[in-house]
Amino acid sequence: SGHLLLLLGLLTLWAELTPVSGAAKYCKLPLRIGPCKRKIPSFYYKWKAKQCLPFDYSGCGGNANRFKTIEECRRTCVG
């Protein structure tokens, strides 16, 4: 019972940390800050440079290539 619980916990952790197969699709999207006026510190993945870079998100619009932290960007797009 204890081993089964440990295995279940490890599988859950693995599932949470493994990037989704569709992630690369939106990592290739161009930077879109959106049309609104706010300046929310965010990160996007620059496909050609193969790196996560900072930008100020406007608060609306944009696309899925937008992350709250550089760690989230790297985990999703860099691997």
Swiss-Prot record:
One of its GO terms (molecular function) is serine-type endopeptidase inhibitor activity. Pfam families: Kunitz_BPTI (PF00014). SUPFAM superfamilies: BPTI-like (SSF57362). InterPro entries: Kunitz_BPTI (IPR002223), Kunitz_BPTI_sf (IPR036880), Prtase_inh_Kunz-CS (IPR020901), TFPI/VKTCI-like (IPR050098). GO terms for cellular component: extracellular space. The record marks 25, 28, 47-48 as: Important for binding to potassium channels. It comes from the Eukaryota. Changing residue 39 to A: Slight decrease in binding affinity for Kv. Important decrease in binding affinity for Kv. Changing residue 74 to A: Slight decrease in binding affinity for Kv. Disulfide bonds join 27-77, 36-60, 52-73. It is found in: Secreted. Changing residue 38 to A: Slight decrease in binding affinity for Kv. Expressed by the venom gland. Keywords: Disulfide bond, Ion channel impairing toxin, Neurotoxin, Potassium channel impairing toxin, Secreted, Signal, Toxin, Voltage-gated potassium channel impairing toxin. Negative results: does not inhibit serine proteases and voltage-gated potassium channels Kv1.2/KCNA2 and Kv1.6/KCNA6. Serine protease inhibitor homolog that selectively blocks voltage-gated potassium channels homooligomer Kv1.1/KCNA1 (EC(50)=0.6 nM) and Kv1.1-containing heterooligomer. Belongs to the venom Kunitz-type family. PANTHER family: BPTI_KUNITZ INHIBITOR DOMAIN-CONTAINING PROTEIN, KUNITZ-TYPE PROTEASE INHIBITOR-RELATED. This is Kunitz-type serine protease inhibitor homolog dendrotoxin K. It comes from Dendroaspis polylepis polylepis.
